[in-house]
């Protein structure tokens, strides 16, 4: 197979419209035919489409003086700088505190307007409204247990005891059972004493004497020894 020689420069070589060599051949042929032709006379249809760059545009390298012309760069080493002037009109730290600093006041919450009463039942706030003109001062809330329990009766002796009468504290009613009456009679015999001193109970309330476990064990040992000697 013979090696193919590359085409000569300046000659139009056949190529496909998609290949970049077609546009190069058109320009070379036009330059050879008329050397005084200008590039501007080439129709735009023959120019290649500009390639779209996928990279972000590079920032313009513009000096800061042109970007911010109003910004004045001052030399901090210059000792002849103009000192800052105090603005006494808008500076609260340089003026009187009575005019600028206001005293803090606690906000008093205003109660919402209401034309009824509020109840709290099982953690929920319930409002009960009344007709306008109703005197709420005479209104009494309903009792939680308006009716008495069925087990209670009027024969209960404690129902007649006044809880506000402190003189009745410690006195048992006489119509209790026999044990209560006995304890009530023994209580009346005990002399009154201060709360700090100890008073021995009467003989009727004392426990009967009993033998200690050590003494009972020693008695059983002696009995067993006596039985063995027999």
Curated annotation (Swiss-Prot):
Q: What is the effect of changing residue 5 to A?
A: No effect on phenotype and no reduction in 32-P incorporation mediated by MAPK
- Region annotation Required for activity as a cdc2 kinase inhibitor: where it falls in the sequence: 101-230
* Consequence when changing residue 62 to A: Reduces growth rate into small colonies containing many elongated cells. Phenotype enhances due to increased stability
UniProt-recorded Gene Ontology molecular function terms: cyclin-dependent protein serine/threonine kinase inhibitor activity
Q: What is the effect of changing residue 62 to S?
A: Shift in mobility
> CDK inhibitory and cyclin-binding: where is this region?
67-147
Q: Where is the composition biased (Basic and acidic residues)?
A: 78-91, 219-230
The modified positions for Phosphothreonine read 13, 58, 62
Positions with biased composition (Polar residues): 93-102
Q: Which GO terms describe its biological process?
A: mitotic G1 cell size control checkpoint signaling; negative regulation of G1/S transition of mitotic cell cycle; negative regulation of mitotic cell cycle; negative regulation of mitotic cell cycle DNA replication; negative regulation of mitotic DNA replication initiation; positive regulation of proteasomal ubiquitin-dependent protein catabolic process; traversing start control point of mitotic cell cycle
Query: Which keywords does the record carry?
Result: Cell cycle, Nucleus, Phosphoprotein
Q: Is Nucleus a UniProt keyword of this protein?
A: yes
Described purpose of this protein according to its UniProt entry? Regulator of cell cycle G1 phase progression. Ensures the correct sequence of S phase and mitosis in the cell by acting as an inhibitor of the cdc2 mitotic kinase. Probably interacts with cdc2 to inhibit its action until the cell mass for Start is reached. Determines the length of the pre-Start G1 period and prevents mitosis from happening in early G1 cells. Required for maintaining pheromone-induced G1 arrest. Acts as an adapter protein since interaction with cdc13 promotes cyclin proteolysis during G1.
Self-association and partners: Interacts with cdc13, cig2 and pop1.
Q: What is this protein called?
A: Cyclin-dependent kinase inhibitor rum1
């Amino acid at each position: 197979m013979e090696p193919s020689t590359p085409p000569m420069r300046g000659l139009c070589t056949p190529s496909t419209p998609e290949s970049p060599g077609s546009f190069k051949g058109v320009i070379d042929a036009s330059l050879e035919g008329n050397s005084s032709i200008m590039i501007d006379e080439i129709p735009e249809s023959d120019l290649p489409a500009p390639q779209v760059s996928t990279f972000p545009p590079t920032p313009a390298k513009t000096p800061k003086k042109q970007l911010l012309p109003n910004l004045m760069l001052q030399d901090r080493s210059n000792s002849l700088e103009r000192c800052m002037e105090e603005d006494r009109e808008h500076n609260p730290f340089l003026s009187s505190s009575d005019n600028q600093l206001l005293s803090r006041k606690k906000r008093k919450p205003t109660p919402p307007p209401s034309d009824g009463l509020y109840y709290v039942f099982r953690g929920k706030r319930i409002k009960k409204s009344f007709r306008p003109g109703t005197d709420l001062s005479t209104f009494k809330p309903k009792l939680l247990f308006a009716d008495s329990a069925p087990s209670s009766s009027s024969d209960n002796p404690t129902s007649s005891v006044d809880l506000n009468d402190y003189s009745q504290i410690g006195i048992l009613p006489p119509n209790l059972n026999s044990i209560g009456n006995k304890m009530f009679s023994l209580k009346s015999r005990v002399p009154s004493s201060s709360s700090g001193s100890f008073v021995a109970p009467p003989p009727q309330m004392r426990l009967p004497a009993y033998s200690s476990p050590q003494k009972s064990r020693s008695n059983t040992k002696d009995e067993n020894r006596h039985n063995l000697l027999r």
